[in-house]
């Protein structure tokens, strides 16, 4: 009985931790059309987050980033790293900043701010130029 309780407790702690970090699999939703676009896996490497397109959910699964201007130019969007260099915001718990996000539709790179909402079930992803108030936000849904 004690072993079962300990296993349940450890499982609950793991679930609680997973909800306090953006690391995991997210379904992206287009902020204009509300269409599900892709699955993005966010990983944490030494406190720095990055995100890779794991699967494209539209009929454009073979899309390439033709407008990209860096090493991603002409590369398949599926498997591409679109989030890079993101770190926890020391001033605001539940927020990550300092990196960038690529919009593979137009090849543009924006500064990015990530914020967990609804107990970690959703992630507000704000891409911007200059200041965060000069940008737009997509809300992604946690898959795992």
Model features per residue range: what roles?
Residues 20-37, 136-144:
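K/E-rich alpha-helical interaction surfaces of small helical-bundle regulatory domains
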Residues 19-25, 91-100, 121-124:
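Short, hydrophobic/aromatic-rich segments at coil-to-beta transitions
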Residues 45, 117-119:
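Structural motif
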Residues 112-116, 131:
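Exposed beta-sheet edge/beta-hairpin loop segments within beta-rich domains
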Residues 120-122, 128-144:
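Edge beta-strand at a domain terminus
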Residues 4-13:
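Sec-dependent N-terminal signal peptides
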